[in-house]
């Protein structure tokens, strides 16, 4: 991953401070940071929501299996917002913070856990639809 070269950069104000966060992004993709990547297809543009998968129920035996964010070991959660098969925006949030928002919204009954996904599969996936603005809402940032 290319790094900013302090000798050729004209952005020298707060360069040392910014270098810490540049390294954080490098670590996220190259080193000790783990990142789960999810892509939201076109529908996010119409609804303004992202889907956060939580679990699935198998139709043959009604067994519940936790999936998605509930079992992820990733430190970061990447949400690629795709339109016409092209990534238009990327939102990156700490996995534990996004899971915390899901739990908070469920406790407050603000957004419901609902069935989502392919109806013809052997299981039904459940998750929460969260408006994108909620992720960026200042009061939700811990």
Ranges and model annotations:
Residues 3, 7-16, 64, 80-142:
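Non-catalytic C-terminal interaction segments of nucleic acid-processing enzymes
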Residues 16-34:
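N-terminal domain-onset segments
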Residues 24, 38, 55, 120-122, ...:
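Intrinsically disordered, low-complexity regions of eukaryotic proteins
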Residues 28-29, 33-46:
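Conserved catalytic cores of phosphodiester-cleaving nucleases, focusing on short active-site segments
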Residues 32, 64-66, 73-77, 87-88:
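Short, surface-exposed beta-edge/turn micro-motifs
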Residues 36, 53, 78-80:
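Residues in well-ordered beta-strands of folded domains
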Residues 42-70:
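Mg2+/Mn2+-dependent nuclease catalytic core
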Residues 45, 70-72, 85-86, 106:
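A generic structural signal for short, non-catalytic loop/turn and secondary-structure boundary residues
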């Amino acid at each position: 991953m290319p790094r900013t070269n302090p000798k050729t950069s004209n952005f020298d104000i707060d360069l040392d401070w910014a270098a810490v966060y540049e390294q954080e992004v490098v670590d996220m993709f190259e080193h000790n940071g783990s990142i789960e990547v999810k892509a939201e297809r076109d529908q996010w543009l119409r609804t303004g929501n992202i889907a956060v998968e939580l679990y699935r129920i198998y139709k043959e035996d009604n067994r519940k299996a936790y999936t998605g964010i509930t079992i992820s070991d990733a430190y970061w959660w990447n949400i690629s917002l795709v339109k016409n098969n092209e990534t238009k925006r990327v939102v990156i949030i700490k996995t534990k913070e996004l899971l915390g928002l899901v739990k908070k919204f469920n406790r407050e009954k603000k957004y419901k856990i609902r069935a989502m996904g392919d109806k013809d599969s052997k299981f039904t996936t459940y998750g929460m639809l969260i408006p994108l603005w909620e992720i960026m809402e200042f009061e939700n940032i811990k």
